[in-house]
Regions:
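N-terminal leader segment of winged-helix/HTH proteins
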Residues: 1-26
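Hydrophobic recognition helices of helix-based DNA-binding modules
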Residues: 15, 19, 72, 98-101, ...
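C-terminal regulatory/oligomerization modules of transcriptional regulators
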Residues: 119-147
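N-terminal helix-turn-helix DNA-binding core of bacterial DNA-binding proteins
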Residues: 17-60
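Charged, amphipathic alpha-helical coiled-coil/dimerization segments
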Residues: 66-126
């Protein structure tokens, strides 16, 4: 029998696997889907913001960004807050591409949200955020490894 913690990890892993499957169905890699998803749903972001929000390696995000820039789907602009950082901006071609890729997933998420209900979704989000906050605290305080 699985413990609650194992169920949480299992559900999280399964969700990631399903988003990876969605990316494959949509004809992109998981990291590309997450970058497009971020830009489509959250607007102008930096690579760092995407990396942190979606738990992607900085180099992975950088590789996706380079590919999207090369394909003329994305352009980079200097950040007003920090000139060392670049803001990622979808081009007109990029906006159309991102919508084509991300919209089917957003519609599916919308149908799922309706099935689950707002209250349950809010509880799920709150509990998951709390779990992550407490796990991060534990990690920052140092795990006790015993060989």
């Amino acid at each position: 029998m699985k413990t609650r913690e194992q169920k949480i990890i299992s559900a999280w892993t399964k969700s990631n696997a399903l988003y990876t499957k969605a990316a494959a169905i949509l004809g992109v890699s998981y990291p590309e889907l997450m970058v497009l998803y971020a830009l489509q749903t959250m607007g102008e972001l930096t690579q760092k913001q995407i990396s942190e929000s979606f738990a992607l390696q900085k180099q992975t995000v950088n590789n996706v960004v380079k590919s999207l820039v090369q394909s003329e789907l994305l352009q980079l602009a200097a950040s007003q807050a920090d000139k060392r950082e670049k803001i990622l901006l979808l081009t007109a071609k990029g906006k159309a591409y991102a919508q084509k890729i991300v919209l089917p997933l957003l519609k599916a998420e919308g149908r799922i949200s309706q099935s689950i209900g707002e209250e349950k979704l809010q509880v799920m989000c709150d509990v998951y955020e709390l779990f992550n906050l407490l796990l991060e605290k534990e990690l920052n305080e140092g795990l006790q490894y015993e060989p």
